[in-house]
UniProtKB/Swiss-Prot annotation:
Disulfide bonds: none
Gene: Cutc
Protein name: Copper homeostasis protein cutC homolog
GO MF: copper ion binding
UniProt-listed GO biological process terms: protein tetramerization
Function: May play a role in copper homeostasis. Can bind one Cu(1+) per subunit.
HAMAP family reported for this sequence: CutC
Length: 272
C-alpha cells in the first residue's frame, strides 16, 4: 500500500472516533485540562471529550487548551460545543457562537465534535442540529446529554439517526447511568448498531460492570477524577472565585491514571 493511502486510512480511523477500540470496547474520558488529558491517555482511554466547566456539565473549552492537548496526546480528542451551562434552548446569538466554535475547533485539530440542542417542548431541534452537523463534517458528531432532557427518548434516537449523528451520550434520562440502565438497554436494543449509544453519568469502578453487562454497551463515558491538593503555600481560605465556598481553589479535580486503568481493566474483563 502506498504511504499516502495508509496515512489517509489511519486518519479516517482516528476521525471516526473508533481509534482505541481494538480491544472490543472504547472508554471515553471527559477532561477539562491538559494534565487530565495526558492522564486519561496514560490510563488507557481510547478517546477524550474535551470540555471546560465540568461542574456545569461541560462547556466549550478554550482553543488554547485544545491546541496544547492535541500536541500532548495521540488518542482522538472530541470537543464539546456548548456556549453556556443550563438548558439546551439556544438564542440566535448563541447559535452564532456555536458555529464559530465549531470552525475554530476544526482549525485547531479536533477529531470530533459534541453538541446538542432542543426545542422549547423538549424535542431535538432538527433544523439547528442539521446545520451544525453539516458544519462539523467531515468530522464525526456526538449528541451529548441534552438527550437526557428530551420528551420522548425513543423517538429522539430515531431523529438523531436521520440527522447523521454517529453516537449519543446518555444516562438513560436519569440522574446516573446506573439509575437509567433499563432505558439505556432499550435504546441500545432499538439502535441495532445504527448509532452508538454510550452510557455516561456517574460511572465508577463500583458500577461499570453492572452497566456494561446490563446494557450491552461497547463504549462508555466517565470522568475518573480525583482531588489533588494545590501547590500554593500561602492560602486565603475566606475567598472563593466562584459563587460558593463549597469548591476550594486549593483543591483541583484531575483525571486519575489509576482510576482510568481500573475502569479499563473492568471493561476488558466484561467485553473481551
Amino acid at each position: 500500500m502506498k504511504k499516502g493511502a495508509s496515512c489517509e486510512r489511519k486518519q479516517a480511523w482516528i476521525s471516526s472516533g473508533k481509534a482505541g477500540a481494538g480491544n472490543g470496547f472504547l472508554m471515553e474520558v471527559c477532561v477539562d485540562s491538559v494534565e487530565s488529558a495526558v492522564n486519561a491517555e496514560r490510563g488507557g482511554a481510547g478517546r477524550i471529550e474535551l470540555c471546560s466547566g465540568l461542574l456545569e456539565g461541560g462547556t466549550t473549552p478554550s482553543m488554547g487548551v485544545l491546541q496544547v492537548v492535541k500536541q500532548s496526546v495521540q488518542i482522538p480528542v472530541f470537543v464539546m460545543i456548548r456556549p453556556r451551562g443550563g438548558d439546551f434552548l439556544y438564542s440566535d446569538r448563541e447559535v452564532e457562537v456555536m458555529k464559530a466554535d465549531i470552525r475554530l475547533a476544526k482549525l485547531y485539530g479536533a477529531d470530533g465534535l459534541v453538541f446538542g440542542a432542543l426545542t422549547e417542548d423538549g424535542h431535538i431541534d432538527k433544523e439547528l442540529c442539521l446545520s451544525l452537523v453539516a458544519l462539523c463534517r467531515p468530522l464525526p458528531v456526538t449528541f451529548h446529554r441534552a438527550f437526557d432532557m428530551v420528551h420522548d427518548p425513543m423517538a429522539a434516537l430515531e431523529t438523531l439517526l436521520t440527522l447523521g449523528f454517529e453516537r449519543v451520550l446518555t444516562s438513560g434520562c436519569d440522574s446516573s447511568a446506573l439509575e437509567g440502565l433499563p432505558l439505556i438497554k432499550q435504546l441500545i436494543d432499538q439502535a441495532k448498531g445504527r448509532i452508538v449509544v454510550m452510557p455516561g453519568g456517574g460511572i465508577t469502578d463500583k458500577n461499570l460492570q453492572r452497566i456494561l453487562e446490563g446494557s450491552g454497551a461497547t463504549e462508555f463515558h466517565c470522568s475518573a477524577r480525583s482531588s489533588r491538593d494545590s501547590g500554593m503555600k500561602f492560602r486565603n481560605s475566606s475567598v472563593a472565585m466562584g459563587a460558593s465556598l463549597a469548591h476550594s481553589e486549593y483543591s483541583l479535580k484531575v483525571t486519575d491514571v489509576t482510576k482510568v486503568r481500573t475502569l479499563n481493566a473492568i471493561a476488558k474483563d466484561v467485553l473481551v
